[in-house]
């Protein structure tokens, strides 16, 4: 759930 260039899933 990162709001950066690359959105990562919240694990």
UniProtKB/Swiss-Prot annotation:
Subcellular location(s) of the protein: Secreted
Top-level lineage group: Eukaryota
Pfam families assigned: Periviscerokin (PF08259)
GO CC entries: extracellular region
Function (record text): Mediates visceral muscle contractile activity (myotropic activity).
Single biological process term from Gene Ontology: neuropeptide signaling pathway
Source species: Perisphaeria ruficornis
Protein name: Periviscerokinin-3
Keywords: Amidation, Neuropeptide, Secreted
Family membership: Belongs to the periviscerokinin family.
Residues where Valine amide is found: 11
Entry annotated with the keyword Secreted: yes
